[in-house]
Amino acid sequence: MKKDVKVLALDFGASSGRAIIGSFDGEKISLKEIHRFTNDPVILLDTMYWDVLRLFHDIKIGLIKAKQEGEIKSLGIDTWGVDFGLLNKDGKLLENPVHYRDARTKGMMEKVFAKLDKDTVYSITGNQFMELNTLFQLMALKENQPELLQKAETLLLMPDLLNYFLSNEKCTEYTIASTTQLLDAKNKTWSSEIIENLDLPKNIFTKIVQPGTKIGKLSKQISEELGIN
């Protein structure tokens, strides 16, 4: 392997995030934290949101600081699971992603199981049943904000949404898809049985890619804004 390789990890937790450079000098791997920031939810009109635009701002700061450390060969993003953003047909974010601690999913398990047997859902996905799962968040939208789902062209989970902001590429990484309770664990694709039985829009789910897949490059706009090739 080539010596002096540097890569950037953007690691997001539910309360904080950080940018870390991983370096390989031909013999050993070393890590250096170059940026750390808080991840604070925002409550607006009784809904709890993620401040995703602020998080993206901190990604940009991390990229600028990484540039000062030398050439970065690649970057990757990881976040918590289940939460997502919806894009319209023009690729614009319809609203800030809602926080998994928001109360909108209360009672949604019962509505799902009225349409699809609980054992069937578990046999397909293998997921633990939690009200915060993407499945129940989508049911909450279908029940209470159907107009939002009607406007949606694409659903992107949090790491994929941030990747999209950087690259304009839309896809869903497999391991984060596994947190949704919508993934067919056997076939490693979206469960058409669950999606169809719950009358969810099929078109919003993007192609699934495996961990480590190169999905693209920084968009021209981001490259020019930050001065990064």
Briefly describe each language-model feature range.
Residues 102:
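Carbohydrate-associated surface elements
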Residues 106-117:
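Hinge/lid segment of periplasmic solute-binding proteins
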